[in-house]
Amino acid sequence: MAALSCLLDSVRRDIKKVDRELRQLRCIDELSARCLCDLYMHPYCCCDLHPYPYCLCYSKRSRSCGLCDLYPCCLCDVKLYCLRPSLRSLERKAIRAIEDEKRELAKLRRTTNRILASSCCSSNILGSVNVCGFEPDQVKVRVKDGKVCVSAERENRYDCLGSKKYSYMNICKEFSLPPCVDEKDVTYSYGLGSCVKIESPCYPCTSPCNPCNPCNPCSPCSPCNPCNPCSPCSPCSPCNPCDPCNPCYPCGSRFSCRKMIL
């Protein structure tokens, strides 16, 4: 019974929705069948907005245009003809709204790609390429000689008056890999916003060696015990070329060097 009641509720909602749409269609039909002269223009209006130089009410109805008694001149001259928005103005507003939404969407997509490209310090993303307008199977990624090349190509076909027209779209972006990233470890994925992300399992680093233990070609020895070419001997017992004799029996004492040699 609970399932049947839920089904009946959904059917009632669908019926109400269809009734609303039918009422809207009836209102649109009534407005389109009504004479536009009663609402928008003077019977002798010759402006660019109205295609007829005279009021059509004289040929359709016995009475004259309803605005003739109130306004002796054309309302288009004083910009008062828009008592209610016409279909043409509504179309212009809808087109402007669609264009604004497209610009906002493109701005958000560029911001997202910029954030993804600058987030290499907190993730393993090496780069990102925007491939908007291409399908995932049309995107190709090639890694060779320390470089990543992202390319995409598509063919558009249009049928126009019995003939066919073709147009081609392609994109190609290339960037170099960091020195610490191996070509075999590079992967790519097609994410949200038509963005191809190039990733690696290890974090990219700016220097080829570990920043905590860098390789210094100028000091090949350990920094705690460097090789000093200026003092090859120990500083505690230096070699003195001016005192070749035993420091305990120096020259000039009561024992001469000759006696010591003998």
Curated annotation (Swiss-Prot):
Modified residues (Phosphoserine): S5, S10, S64, S86, S122, S123, S151, S167, S189, S194
UniProt keyword Cytoplasm present: yes
Domain of life: Eukaryota
Stretches for region 2 X 5 AA repeats of [RC]-C-L-C-D: 34-77
Sequence repeats: 34-38, 73-77
Compartment annotation: Cell projection, Cilium, Flagellum; Cytoplasm, Cytoskeleton; Cytoplasm, Cytoskeleton, Microtubule organizing center, Centrosome
InterPro entries: A-crystallin/Hsp20_dom, HSP20-like_chaperone, ODF1_ACD, ODFP
GO cellular component, one term: cytoplasm
Keyword Cell wall biogenesis/degradation: no
Disulfide links within the chain: none
Tissue expression profile of the protein: Testis.
Secretion signal, residue range per the UniProt entry: none
Start and end residues of each stretch annotated as C-X-P repeat region: 209-250
Keywords linked to the UniProt accession: Cell projection, Cilium, Cytoplasm, Cytoskeleton, Developmental protein, Differentiation, Flagellum, Phosphoprotein, Repeat, Spermatogenesis
SUPFAM superfamilies per the UniProt record, alphabetical: HSP20-like chaperones
Gene3D superfamilies: 2.60.40.790
Record-level GO BP terms: cell differentiation; spermatogenesis
Function according to Swiss-Prot or TrEMBL: Component of the outer dense fibers (ODF) of spermatozoa. ODF are filamentous structures located on the outside of the axoneme in the midpiece and principal piece of the mammalian sperm tail and may help to maintain the passive elastic structures and elastic recoil of the sperm tail.
Annotated domain remarks: The C-terminal contains many C-X-P repeats.
Subunit: Interacts (via leucine zipper motif) with TCP11. Interacts with SPAG4. Interacts with KLC3. Interacts with CCDC42.
Protein name, UniProt field: Outer dense fiber protein 1
Originating species: Bos taurus (Bovine)
Gene: ODF1
